Swiss-Prot record:
GO CC terms: cytoplasm; nucleus
Residue spans of biased composition, Low complexity class: 344-365, 396-407, 430-447
Protein name in UniProt: CREB-regulated transcription coactivator 3
Cell compartment(s), UniProt: Nucleus; Cytoplasm
């Protein structure tokens, strides 16, 4: 019995020792666990700091521009690849637990592995080049010897000198090829442009070759403006700019540099802005509407009139449905020019032929089939003068106008103008299917000239008068807004031509045209004569300075069988006023059945009843009294 308490007394001591040992082991394990966790937290914090530093350095190149570099993003998987090695080491520590204590040197040694592979040091670079570019393998060292890159670089440097190396660097990322076609000097020249393994950071952008000197800049400016991507290049079209075309290139050719996403419109025919057109066929209308593509002459552009969106081309006005069928019709038209403007005389090859609209039938116009865009019809102005497009023209195949020199501020140019003699009308087909020759061919034929203004072409048919009573309301509705731009000098006077002008058009006083009165509002500063309404007031240089009217808008058939054209406003006593009064009188009636038809009281209809509906729907029902049927007939109403 005594051994039992001794044994029982020794048991608690053993348990206490076991408990003490257990607590000691637990404390050691807890201490080891705390050390491990502290190591993990320290390594995790350091890893996060390193990752943030690397991301901040890699993002520093994006902060300079508005868009990220796509080429650098494509190489980003190799940038972030070293960041996964510390996580693998941490996982290894977690799996091994207390057995393996990972030293901190191993955490950082993984970052040096890509560089130690190539035997290079990263301590000399303040930015840590490991995180800025992928490891430069041997394949990347041969990038600069790519023949395709050399071709694109040489073409880029020759065409776009002031673009610098930025455009060449955008074209740089091509698959690396081993090619030893370049010499060492060429590799050195293109090394800083095609350093693709190094990312396009601001440091690299500062090393780009500087623009060329100012002389080469000015020489290459025009070619660089007109240069387009190769997807938009049109073969066999080369623009050689002249000395005076640099001022207008920024406005005219600014829309050509559109890139590859928009269609190339250079194959369409627009008038050439050059004074000497490249195409020999452009001589006919390089001078007519070469100022802009909307057909406005140069004088309108100088006076401040720009082409409105609603303005149509001069040669394709669909509103013209009549042409001049008398080819010998002309009159003495003197246009007033503002001071300080050169007014060269017309070329002797000025010819009265026409740029009519393509909407007219070609059989009636005698259109040349191979020059469909400029059909030749009997009356047109094709001035051959190429020096200045703001031409003040005179057409004087007739006797001079009876007009005093001091015609209310209008300067009349009485100098003789050489004009070609017009062919007699009988052998000249007006409405035929035969195509007429080219304009430049007819200009070569018309080389003779007259030094007088008294040439009288024979014609048997007089032209009827055209009466005009136009005011602001009718003119503003008849023409567009930009054609009545009030920029003409007010000294031009109230009437440009006097009211009693006689045009001895056809050689005999008996067949001369009647007097034409042109009444206009003096605020408009626009006066029209008989000649301007006969087609001589178009935009082809005839009345460019005096008339701001729509080109080729007023045409009239002057064949002898055409009635008078009377354009009136609301204030004149005309047929339109009578019609408006009649319509107003009818509208006053209100179309009331009582007042309009004046039915008898017994014939006034009331609301239909069921009996009336049954009578109307019954086809077999006959009216009992024929007098009732007679009363409903239309002749009674």
């Amino acid at each position: 019995m005594a051994a039992t308490p001794a044994a029982s007394g020794s048991n608690p001591r053993k348990f206490s020792e076991k408990i003490a040992l257990h607590n000691q082991k637990q404390a050691e394990e807890t201490r080891a666990f705390d050390e491990l966790m502290s190591d993990l937290t320290v390594s995790r914090v350091q890893f996060q700091k390193l990752q943030q530093l690397r991301l901040a350095q890699s993002r520093a190149q994006y902060y300079g521009g508005s868009l990220p570099n796509v080429n650098q993003i494509s190489s980003s998987p190799t940038d972030f690849q070293p960041s996964f090695h510390p996580t693998d080491n941490i996982r290894g520590m977690r799996h091994h637990g207390l057995v393996e204590r990972v030293s901190r040197n191993r955490l950082h040694s993984s970052h040096h592995r890509p560089i130690e592979k190539h035997g290079r040091q990263c301590d000399s670079s303040p930015y840590g080049s490991v995180y800025l570019s992928p490891p430069p393998d041997n394949n990347w060292r041969r990038t600069n010897s790519d023949s395709a890159l050399h071709t694109s670089a040489s073409s880029t440097k020759s065409q776009d000198p002031f673009m610098g190396g930025a455009q060449a660097m955008l074209r740089a990322p091509k698959p690396p090829q081993r090619n030893t076609s370049l010499q060492d000097g060429e590799i050195d020249n293109f090394g800083e442009v095609f350093s693709f393994p190094n990312a396009m950071t601001e440091e690299n952008m500062l090393n780009v070759t500087k623009p060329l000197p100012k002389q080469i800049w000015e020489a290459q400016k025009v070619q660089c403006i007109t240069s387009r991507p190769r997807s938009c290049e049109v073969p066999n079209i080369k623009v050689f700019p002249s000395s005076d075309s640099n001022a207008s290139l920024s406005h005219f050719q600014g829309s050509l540099n559109t890139g590859g996403s928009l269609p190339d419109l250079t194959n369409l025919h627009f008038p050439s802005p050059l004074p000497t057109p490249l195409d020999p066929d452009d001589t006919a209308y390089a001078n007519i509407s070469a100022e802009n593509s909307s057909g406005l002459p140069a004088a309108m552009t100088h006076l401040g009139i720009s082409g409105s969106p609603g303005m149509q081309n001069t040669r394709s006005n669909p509103s013209i449905q009549a042409t001049m069928n008398n080819n010998s019709l002309a009159s003495n038209v003197n246009s007033h020019t503002p001071p300080g403007r050169n007014n060269p005389a017309l070329h002797p090859s000025l010819r009265l032929s026409s740029l009519s609209n393509p909407s007219l039938p070609t059989s009636a116009l005698g259109t040349s089939p191979r020059r469909r865009h400029t059909p030749v019809s009997p009356l047109t102005l094709t001035p051959g003068s190429e020096s200045n497009r703001s031409i003040s023209n005179q057409f004087s195949p007739t006797s001079p106008m009876n007009m005093p020199p001091n015609s209310q501020g209008v300067s009349m140019d009485r100098s003789p103008l050489s004009l070609p003699p017009l062919e007699p009308p009988p052998p000249y087909p007006l409405y035929s299917d035969q195509p007429q020759p080219h304009l430049h061919h007819t200009q070569q034929q018309m080389h003779e000239s007259l030094d007088s203004q008294n040439y009288q072409p024979p014609s048997p048919v007089p032209c009827p008068p055209l009466d005009l009573n136009l005011a602001n309301s009718s003119l503003s509705g008849f023409f567009g807004d930009s054609f009545f731009d009030q920029q003409q000098p007010t000294k031009q006077g109230k009437y440009l031509w006097q009211q009693q002008e006689q045009y001895d058009m056809f050689g005999s006083p008996s067949s001369s045209l009647p007097n034409t009165n042109a009444f206009f509002d003096p605020n408009m500063n626009l006066q029209y004569s008989q000649a301007s309404l006969m087609g001589l007031g178009g935009s082809h240089g005839s009345l460019q300075d005096s008339f701001h009217l729509r080109p080729n808008y007023l045409y009239s058939n002057c064949g002898g069988s055409v009635p008078n054209i009377i354009l009136t406003d609301d204030s004149s006593n005309s047929l339109s006023k009578d019609i408006s009064n009649a319509v107003a009188g009818v509208s006053e009636l209100g179309f009331d059945a009582d007042n309009t038809f004046q039915l008898d009281d017994e014939l006034k209809l009331g609301p239909l009843s069921l009996d009336g509906l049954s009578m109307l729907s019954d086809p077999d029902m006959v009216l009992p009294d024929p007098s009732i049927e007679d009363s409903f007939r239309s002749d009674k109403l």
